[in-house]
Every structure is written in structure tokens, then in C-alpha cells.
């Protein structure tokens, strides 16, 4: 038997049927799905050095299980003391099984470790069915060794869905188990 991550199995066996039932799709191909998860981590340019960049890349690689790349600035910006070609952020795009494994670890392990966590903001959709989640500290992930961590950067996690409507995407992420804030738990 082949390995299948828990959220992917859940999607195939239960979520598709619940989405068809709720939104009355005529075909299984109309059902929205999670296309990719993009993790972006900005780096403070003022403390930039190669060691900082390499540590940040190693941390994101440990969290996601996939090698991260750095993004370079496109132009000079004197207000930020930024030069063209300077690394300003790190990103990694997750697809297929690695995406589902990361989603499982995020929902079941990392988010419950956030101090005073009451749920994620339900208004962070972009109007195209994509959801953005900001995390202020990367130490919520158990893969990060807090003893050797010098710079604790935050990160932005974007869930890209095939849905074009926020309502459908929100219900899809809710069925995956993403804990949205409700009036009860605030």
C-alpha cells in the first residue's frame, strides 16, 4: 500500500463529498482543492550577512522539508538602505505530499504551541480564494532548535486554492482542520 498523508486522505474520502453536498457541484472536477502552500520569510536587511541568510534557509528547510530559496531586491531603495541584488526574503513553495505533510504539522503541532492561541483570523482571504496566515515566531515549529537560534524571524504562509470564492476556500480550509476564530473563543 502506498503512503498517503493524513490531510490528503481526508480530502479524498470526506472533504470532497462535504463540499459537493454544501455547494451543489455537478462534477467532482468543480470541487476546490489546495494547490500549493507558499512560505515567505522576510529578512531584516540591516542585520544581513551570509551566516544569517544560511541559518534562515536551514530553519525554513527544516520546517518544510524542502530547500528554500532567497529572493533578491530588484532595485536600490535608499530609505531602507537596500541595494539591488541584496537578499531580502526566503521562500519555499510546497506542492503534493510535502504540502499535505506541512499542513498536518501546522494544524496539529505548531498552531497549538502558539501562546494564547484562540484561532486564526477568518478575514485574511484575498478575494480570489487564497488565505494568508502570519506567524510572528518560527519557534512554534518543533524542528527549530531554540538554543542555536539567533534571529527569530516571523513568516507568512499563503494557502493557494483552486477556488475563486472566499466562502468555498474558507470551508475547504475549515474541513482540513484550520481553526478559525469564532465569537465563542475570543
UniProtKB/Swiss-Prot annotation:
Function text: This is one of the proteins that bind and probably mediate the attachment of the 5S RNA into the large ribosomal subunit, where it forms part of the central protuberance. In the 70S ribosome it contacts protein S13 of the 30S subunit (bridge B1b), connecting the 2 subunits; this bridge is implicated in subunit movement. Contacts the P site tRNA; the 5S rRNA and some of its associated proteins might help stabilize positioning of ribosome-bound tRNAs.
GO cellular component, one term: ribonucleoprotein complex
Entries under SUPFAM superfamilies matching the protein: RL5-like
Complexes and interactors: Part of the 50S ribosomal subunit; part of the 5S rRNA/L5/L18/L25 subcomplex. Contacts the 5S rRNA and the P site tRNA. Forms a bridge to the 30S subunit in the 70S ribosome.
Keyword RNA-binding part of the UniProt annotation: yes
Alphabetical list of InterPro entries matching this protein: Ribosomal_uL5, Ribosomal_uL5_bac-type, Ribosomal_uL5_C, Ribosomal_uL5_dom_sf, Ribosomal_uL5_N
Family annotation (HAMAP family): Ribosomal_uL5_B
Record-given protein name: Large ribosomal subunit protein uL5
PANTHER family: 60S RIBOSOMAL PROTEIN L11-RELATED
The family this protein is said to belong to: Belongs to the universal ribosomal protein uL5 family.
Pfam families tied to this protein: Ribosomal_L5, Ribosomal_L5_C
Species of origin: Karelsulcia muelleri (strain GWSS)
GO BP terms: translation
Alphabetized GO MF terms: rRNA binding; structural constituent of ribosome; tRNA binding
Keywords, in A-Z order: Ribonucleoprotein, Ribosomal protein, RNA-binding, rRNA-binding, tRNA-binding
Amino acid at each position: 500500500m502506498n503512503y498517503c498523508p493524513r490531510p490528503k486522505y481526508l480530502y479524498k474520502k470526506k472533504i470532497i463529498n462535504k463540499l459537493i453536498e454544501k455547494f451543489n457541484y455537478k462534477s467532482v472536477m468543480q470541487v476546490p482543492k489546495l494547490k500549493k502552500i507558499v512560505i515567505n520569510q522576510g529578512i531584516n536587511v540591516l542585520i544581513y550577512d551570509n551566516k544569517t541568510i544560511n541559518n534562515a534557509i536551514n530553519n525554513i528547510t527544516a520546517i518544510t522539508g524542502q530547500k528554500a530559496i532567497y529572493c533578491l531586491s530588484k532595485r536600490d531603495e535608499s530609505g531602507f538602505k537596500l541595494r539591488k541584488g541584496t537578499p531580502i526574503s526566503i521562500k519555499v513553495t510546497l506542492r503534493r505530499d510535502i504540502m499535505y505533510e506541512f499542513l498536518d504539522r501546522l494544524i496539529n503541532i505548531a498552531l497549538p504551541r502558539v501562546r494564547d492561541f484562540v484561532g486564526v483570523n477568518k478575514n485574511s482571504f484575498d478575494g480570489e480564494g487564497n488565505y494568508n496566515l502570519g506567524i510572528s515566531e518560527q519557534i512554534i515549529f518543533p524542528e527549530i532548535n531554540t538554543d542555536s537560534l539567533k534571529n527569530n524571524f516571523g513568516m507568512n504562509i499563503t494557502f493557494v486554492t483552486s477556488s475563486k470564492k472566499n466562502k468555498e476556500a474558507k470551508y475547504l480550509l475549515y474541513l482540513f482542520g484550520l481553526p478559525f476564530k469564532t465569537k465563542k473563543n475570543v
